[in-house]
């Protein structure tokens, strides 16, 4: 449905009065959504086809640089949306923060504006079945449970202030045993080390911890807590889903509960801190309801970390399916099924999604790249190569290749599969011939090379070569970048026409919990039309030569961060 399409009206009996015989195509009232019959609005045709036209699901998409709210129809098509960018704070080298109340206010403003557009199309709020939340992962928020006020800025996922702390923790004998429990290697990336740094270095956080009033959460927990009314309601909603909890290093990957051994390793006393309760990603009750504003009374029924949400939005429900999201960073998830696979080749093991009920949680191998779209922003904002980030592809396309330039975009060290925390961003191969176009092209290639390295690691861990790669995210809009990805990786790259897959995933999680879709089979045709496939065009020897040169550059970027040489 186009974003400005006019709604269609229909008046018929309520669902309770409808024939539920299968041959009549009426919606059955048994199964996952049966307990939601009492919430159905009156006067809407309830065949499966008409249900999808008239039900809507909202999706909060809270990312690293912006917040958005989208409303999808029952066919998985976005109807309206609103987006707001907010300030990213860099108070010191390697530090990256958000103001927690600004995250919240940006989400609330997006909801108000999108709902205004929704009403302008003639739709009532009652047609919104529920909303889901997807969010930047690992970003750590701490607040006072008695006042609901943040105690410090949110420490964002690529922040590297914890490098010295991580080295100290790695020196402990038990550090090598953590990955088997939680799926993550010890690094600056997960929430655990961010929380520990805050307790050790921020007086207000330490005092709240000692007094038992420190609340911790990732961005999903913070938003759910606040949208439900925060500390002002009798029983504050303080929860997280298992995809977000799996990024903290506090959750056991198999039990999906907090693990005493993991908490003890980081010195976290669960009796002195309020940790969010871990719940499934799709549930009609656990996440509460929006307390105020244009969505007051609407259920929050889904929650997924952004990369898990993108996998769901791409329809990656079968083992062997994979997606790569090219956003601020770059994140490749590979569905491994209902048993976790602990990587031997530098990847993360994580929860892909957990839809609760009788279904088992599904796991994934993940490769994370710290810099993707942020590399383009660096060329735009810091170096002034172009006026707008969208112009980088044109600049990169002005030259036939990178002219021998290799850009290791290690602004926050290198993540998977390398895990080199002492690397810094480094340009190799510059000559008098080098132009802005060569550096722009090398910036796009850096993401493609790192993706290829992750794909190679996934093939080793799984024993199977990926047949194609589904892609989304802002940088996937660049045909040049996607063709380069196909050439370097040697596999087709599959891009959907509707790129809002991350937001769609959260909508799917909420919709499955509240009857918009009753099973995964109902989603087979969602986001399938208009996909574009980029097939490899470069000869394999040429691609391998470029990738080998990239590997050489990675090795040469090591060792730039040394405490005795740093100011």
Where are these regions (language model features)?
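Short beta-strand-to-turn element immediately C-terminal to the catalytic PLP-Schiff-base lysine
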Residues: 72-73, 142-144, 199-200, 224-228, ...
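Gly/Ser/Thr-rich active-site cleft segment
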Residues: 62-64, 178-307, 364-366, 372-376, ...
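Phosphate/pyrophosphate-binding loops at sites that engage ATP/ADP/AMP, CoA/4′-phosphopantetheine
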Residues: 109-129, 202-208, 260-271, 454-467
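N-terminal phosphate-binding loop and adjacent alpha-helix
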Residues: 82-124
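Glycine/Thr-rich phosphate-binding loops that ligate phosphate moieties of nucleotide
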Residues: 2-84, 88-91, 101, 129-172, ...
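Short glycine/proline- and acidic residue-enriched helix-loop micro-motifs
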Residues: 96, 175-186, 359-361, 537
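Short glycine-aspartate micro-motif
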Residues: 55-61, 69, 125-133, 215-216, ...
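Conserved phosphate-binding catalytic cores of ATP/NTP-utilizing and phosphoryl-transfer enzymes
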Residues: 38-53, 286-321, 334
């Amino acid at each position: 449905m186009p974003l400005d399409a006019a709604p269609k009206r229909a008046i018929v009996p309520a669902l309770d009065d409808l024939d539920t015989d299968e041959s009549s195509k009426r919606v059955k009232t048994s199964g996952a959504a049966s307990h939601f019959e009492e919430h159905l609005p009156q006067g809407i045709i309830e065949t499966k086809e008409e249900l999808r036209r008239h039900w809507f699901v909202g999706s909060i998409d809270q990312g690293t640089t912006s917040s958005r709210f989208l409303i999808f129809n029952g066919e998985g098509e976005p109807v309206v949306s609103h987006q707001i960018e907010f300030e990213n704070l860099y108070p010191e080298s390697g530090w990256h923060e958000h103001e927690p109340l600004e995250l919240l206010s940006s989400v609330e403003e997006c909801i108000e504006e999108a709902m205004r557009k929704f009403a302008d199309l003639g739709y009532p709020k009652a047609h919104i079945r529920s909303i889901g939340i997807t969010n930047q992962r690992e970003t750590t928020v701490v607040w006072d449970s008695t006042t609901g006020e943040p105690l410090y800025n949110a420490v964002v996922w690529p922040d590297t202030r914890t490098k010295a702390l991580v080295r100290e923790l790695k020196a402990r004998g038990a550090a090598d045993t953590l990955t088997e429990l939680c799926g993550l290697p010890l690094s600056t990336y997960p929430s655990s080390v961010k929380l520990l740094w805050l307790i050790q270095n921020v007086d207000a956080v330490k005092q709240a911890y000692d007094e038992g009033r420190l609340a911790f959460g990732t961005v999903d927990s913070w938003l759910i807590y606040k949208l439900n009314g925060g500390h002002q309601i009798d029983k504050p909603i303080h929860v997280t889903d298992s995809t977000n909890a799996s990024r903290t290093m506090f959750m056991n990957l198999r039990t999906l509960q907090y693990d005493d051994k993991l908490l003890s390793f980081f010195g976290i006393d669960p009796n002195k801190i309020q940790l969010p309760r871990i719940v499934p990603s799709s549930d009609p009750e656990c996440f509460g309801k929006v307390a105020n504003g244009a969505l007051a009374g609407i259920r929050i029924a889904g929650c997924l970390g952004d990369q898990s949400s993108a996998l769901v939005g791409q329809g990656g429900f079968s083992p062997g399916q994979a997606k790569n999201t090219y956003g601020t960073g770059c994140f490749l998830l590979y569905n491994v099924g209902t048993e976790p696979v602990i990587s031997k080749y530098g990847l993360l093991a994580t929860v892909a999604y957990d839809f609760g009920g009788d279904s088992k949680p599904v796991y994934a191998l993940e490769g994370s790249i710290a810099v993707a779209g942020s590399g383009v922003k660096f060329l735009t904002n810091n170096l002034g190569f172009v006026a707008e980030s969208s112009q980088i592809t044109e600049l990169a396309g002005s030259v036939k290749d990178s002219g021998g330039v290799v850009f290791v975009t290690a602004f926050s060290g290198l993540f998977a599969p390398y895990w080199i925390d002492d690397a810094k961003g480094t340009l190799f191969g510059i000559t008098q011939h080098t132009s802005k176009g060569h550096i722009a092209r090398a910036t796009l290639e850096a993401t493609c090379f790192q993706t290829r390295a992750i794909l190679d690691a996934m093939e080793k861990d799984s024993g199977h070569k990926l047949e194609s790669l589904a892609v989304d995210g802002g940088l996937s809009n660049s045909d040049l970048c996607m063709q380069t990805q196909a050439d370097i990786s040697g596999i087709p790259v599959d891009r959907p026409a509707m790129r809002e897959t991350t937001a769609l995933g959260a909508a799917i999680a909420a919709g499955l919990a509240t009857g918009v879709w009753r099973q995964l089979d109902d989603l087979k045709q969602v986001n399938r039309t208009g996909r574009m496939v980029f097939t490899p065009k470069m000869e394999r020897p040429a691609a391998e030569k470029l990738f080998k040169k990239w590997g050489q550059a990675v090795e040469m970027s090591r060792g730039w961060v040394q405490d005795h040489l740093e100011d």
